[in-house]
Amino acid sequence: SQVKNRVDSYFVKQWQRRVIASANGILADNVANDSGDMVKSVAAESIAAQTAATKFNRDAFTDAVFTMGDSAQDLTAIAVHSQVMATMVKNNDIAYVEDSEGRMNIPTYAGLRVIVDDGLTVTAGTTSGVKYTSVLFGGGAFGYGEGMSAVPVEVEREASQGNGGGTESLWVRKTWLLHPFGFKATGTPAGESFTLAELALATSFDRVIPRKNVPLAFLITN
């Protein structure tokens, strides 16, 4: 059970990394090719210029939400770095709701589920300080599919290893696809599939439907 939990946790983290990398590619494409119509940035480029208005705040959040126009209600969650979450907590803006079994408090902000992940993008300011990218999601923002390998799980034993004591290796094979709604893949991977670095490039995606139909938005703050 413990091994299974560790394996499951590993693949969840890999899935999260690919979601974040793909979101970074969408953001880069949007800025390069669609005038940044999915992005609201209030971040300052130096520590000296940082104020409450350049950090996560209700006005900036609202502006990011309404890059979707009258489809703003389609957003259901926001993913933030832990430092941004700290700002939200300090502002007393987080409301906690219980899950269906009353065992867990789920953080929400303005009705959106809050997901905290330090894998989200942190970039250096031009002069000093850092900028945090938060991602707002709606249902169906990413499509997900999983295939079945011929041998999805197996244990390999090597008797000659471990000074003759033998070792066992667990092999887990996953075949899955993750793709953002409303975008076509335009890049060419160097290998069999896109690396995280390749997914984050502006050349990897191109939006093919109107902005309001894409349930994604970005907010950049200090």
Locate predicted features.
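Alpha-helical scaffold segments that mediate packing/assembly in large oligomeric complexes
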Residues: 1-68, 206-208, 218-221
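Short, flexible loop/turn elements at secondary-structure junctions
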Residues: 7, 82-84, 118, 174
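Subunit-assembly interface segments of extracellular/virion macromolecular structures
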Residues: 13, 17, 21-30, 83-84, ...
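Sequence/fold signature of self-assembling virion shell proteins
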Residues: 43-59, 89-222
